[in-house]
A protein has these predicted regions:
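Phosphate-coordinating loops and pocket residues in cytosolic domains that bind phosphorylated ligands
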Residues: 18, 50, 128
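Active-site neighborhoods of divalent-metal-dependent phosphate/nucleic-acid chemistry enzymes
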Residues: 2-4, 74-119
Length: 139
């Protein structure tokens, strides 16, 4: 079995931390057991940190983010390849009249550039991205 790298997007990270759903946790455990890598983009990490820094957020949120991030294999750094893929995605989707949010485009671009399977429970948005390998672990 070839080893995969699963990139979790911000929505699925928030869902996991907030709801702790058995089905998703089971898929995470299975991926780890099969020695697949579990990563997030630096973009997702930034979004989680920003959410935790919100003055209205409970101090527990920062602790949850810290605990979650510690269990990941990596936070992938934003690099030129990710920027180039993101630019391609945004250009293509704008031309088609089906743009997605800037952060979602950046996460999708990063997943494509890094050869990752993007795990999200926001498939409606990401399904517009040509060539992306998506999985929704909530299904």
């Amino acid at each position: 079995m070839s080893k995969k790298t699963y990139m979790l997007d911000t929505n699925i990270c928030s869902f996991i931390m907030r709801e702790r759903p058995d089905a998703v946790l089971g898929k995470l455990e299975q991926a780890v057991t099969n020695q697949h890598r579990i990563v997030v983009s630096a973009i997702t990490y930034s979004e989680m940190r920003f959410g935790a820094a919100n003055p209205k957020a409970s101090p527990k949120v920062a602790a949850m983010v810290n605990a979650f991030v510690e269990r990941l294999d990596a936070i992938l750094p934003w690099d030129a390849a990710a920027v180039d893929q993101t630019t391609q995605i945004r250009t293509t989707l704008a031309r088609l009249g089906t743009p997605i949010g800037n952060n979602d485009a950046a996460i999708a671009g990063h997943a494509l550039a890094a050869g990752c399977v993007l795990v999200t429970n926001n498939t409606r948005e990401f399904a517009r991205v040509p060539g992306i390998d998506l999985e929704d672990w909530t299904q």
